[in-house]
């Protein structure tokens, strides 16, 4: 009976730790810093992520903060879709093993000098305990 209890405890710990194992990683840096002139545009600033598991995953992202000036014209793209503005969140299209996806932003400052930061929390839908913060810092001169 003691052996069975020990095995059950060991099995429950292994399930807990197995689910916390990362299924994706950030390719390169999780922080992008961009600088541009007020009469120019930021065509794309992209942060890539990669599925490092052996099965397909669905990454969820949420906007944690957004301090971009309201005058700036912004949009963002995720793996599988683009949206006007900086939405509150969404889900990537399926990422197969070893496949990369991304979050990207586009900024047209409309001659408005300033700076702003947008941060996205990203995690696997099946493993929300493991997450990363992707940060875009933009300065318009």
Model regions and ranges:
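Hydrophobic beta-strand positions in extracellular immunoglobulin-like domains
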Residues: 48-49, 63, 107, 122
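Surface-exposed binding patches on compact interaction domains or structured appendages
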Residues: 54-100
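A short beta-strand micro-motif common to beta-rich folds, especially ectodomain repeats
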Residues: 114-126
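C-terminal edge beta-strand
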Residues: 131-140
């Amino acid at each position: 009976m003691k052996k069975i209890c020990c095995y059950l405890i060991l099995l429950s710990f292994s399930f807990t730790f197995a689910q916390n194992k990362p299924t994706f990683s950030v390719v390169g840096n999780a922080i992008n810093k961009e600088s541009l002139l007020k009469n120019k545009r930021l065509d794309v600033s992209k942060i890539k992520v990669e599925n490092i598991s052996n099965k397909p995953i669905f990454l969820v992202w949420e906007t944690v903060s957004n301090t971009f000036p309201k005058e700036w014209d912004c949009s963002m793209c995720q793996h599988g879709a683009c949206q006007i503005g900086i939405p509150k969140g969404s889900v990537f299209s399926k990422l197969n093993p070893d496949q990369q996806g991304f979050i990207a932003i586009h900024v047209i400052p409309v001659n408005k000098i300033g700076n702003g930061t947008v941060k996205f929390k990203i995690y696997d839908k099946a493993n929300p305990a493991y997450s990363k913060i992707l940060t875009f810092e933009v300065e318009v001169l």
